[in-house]
């Protein structure tokens, strides 16, 4: 099953065409690496794939649901905001700067979005967060604050936070 399809994606900033007719698909269980020199469009492609940046033209499909497509003039048109919010539940991001909230424990960092954004049950979210911490191996650090963690532990906490969504 294809989780993500990007077809004929184009993106320009001023006179600089950053993405030039890029197409790719990612199937369930597949691992994909995007490699290139600085300024080659890697981050822009990921930002377009995750709806943080709009494409000039192209098609974006998650699990068969179209998030964006071209109109008759060849410009990208996006689905309604309510549909995009549903689609955004399919993915989470971990940035180079992990941005864990410094005044929250690791556990609270993981639980915050599922509780506030998804309005999920606190006991259910707590159980899931602890399971994620166990898998990510900083389970003994659930009460620690980001400044008390190594960079690797911060990264794993951030990955657990993304997976919790």
Predicted regions and their residues:
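ABC family nucleotide-binding domain
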Residues: 2-165
């Amino acid at each position: 099953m294809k989780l993500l399809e990007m077809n004929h994606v184009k993106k320009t900033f001023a006179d600089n065409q950053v993405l030039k007719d890029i197409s790719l698909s990612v199937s369930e269980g597949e691992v994909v690496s995007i490699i290139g020199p600085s300024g080659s469009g890697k981050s822009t492609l990921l930002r377009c794939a995750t709806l943080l940046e709009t494409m000039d033209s192209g098609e974006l499909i998650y699990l068969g649901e179209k998030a964006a497509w071209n109109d008759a003039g060849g410009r990208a048109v996006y689905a309604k905001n309510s549909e995009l919010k549903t689609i955004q539940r399919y993915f989470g991001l971990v940035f180079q700067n992990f941005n864990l909230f410094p005044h929250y424990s690791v556990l609270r960092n993981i639980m915050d979005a599922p509780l506030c954004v998804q309005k999920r049950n606190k006991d259910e979210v707590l159980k899931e967060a602890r399971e994620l911490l166990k898998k990510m191996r900083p389970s003994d650090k659930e009460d620690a604050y980001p400044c008390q963690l190594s960079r690797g532990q911060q990264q794993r906490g951030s990955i657990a936070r993304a997976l919790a969504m």
